[in-house]
Structure formats: C-alpha cells, structure tokens
Amino acid sequence: MESHLEGKAGEVLDLSFAEVMDKEGNFYTENYRSAKARYHYICRDGKQTYKPKLTFWGFRYIRVNAFPGGIDKVTLDAFTAIAVHSDMKRTGYLSCSNNSLNKLFSNIIWGQKGNFVDVPTDCPQRDERLGWTGDAQVFIRTACLNYDAEKFYTKWLADL
C-alpha cells in the first residue's frame, strides 16, 4: 500500500486491513489470528509518499482510522494498492465466453501472486507466512502453467 498525503508534522495516517466483513458489515479480522494488519504513519510537513518496505498485507477492504486533516479529507487517489509477488514471467492465460470461469481464473492468478513472495504460502494475510510443503506441492502444476515458476520452486526447494 502506497499513500500520497499532504499533512502537518505529527498528523497520523492509520489504516486497518481485512479480507471479509461480518454479517453486520463490520471489519472481521479474527481469521488473521494475531496479525495486526495495521498501517500507522506519522507525517512530516508537506506533501509526502509513504510505502512500507518491510511488510505487506493481504486484504480486500481498508478502514481509515485516522487521516491527516481529518477523515473527511480522505480521497481514493491518496492510496495505491500494490501487488507484491515474486518476479515470474506469466505463461498461462484463459479467456472464454463464460464470465464466471474468467473470474475464477483471474482469482487463481491473483491468489498465486499473493502467495508467491519468496516462498509459496497458503495465505498472505495471517500472522504466519510460511512455505508449507503440502500447499506448494498440490498447487505446483497450476503454478507452473500460470507462470514460469521453475526458478521460484528451485530456489525454495534448495532453501528447505
């Protein structure tokens, strides 16, 4: 997540992330276990761009808890979501007349991107982002159809 802000020194940008809402439409983060899924930035004076370098979040929804100048100053162009994933050449594509199938394939691609950050994980949003061997071996054929993942898997297996 990259933020483009204009603020005064000491003002705060505070965001929370979630992938689902509960039945009442509230943020639901119990599935994150102990992961905080928070983005807290203290501004300096003037225009600024902030992009964390040591973390990432898996999310569908963002809640703005605090914003420089007040919540009423929030605009969509203040935020850019960035897909963080290992660099692999895309090799597999699917497009057909069935919109549901096209969406399913798109979700598979995005799921792979979100779970291929140096190691193959089973979820990018929780407190554990470990390269479990079971998930990786079940998905390897699909992964290699979607992307040229040979170097990715070779590196990961050597690390084991």
Sequence positions of predicted segments:
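Extracellular/oxidizing-compartment recognition motifs
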Residues: 1-125, 134-135, 149-160
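Hydrophobic, small-residue-rich membrane helices and short re-entrant helix-turn-helix hairpins
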Residues: 126-127, 139
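Well-ordered alpha-helical scaffold segments within catalytic/enzyme domains
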Residues: 138-149
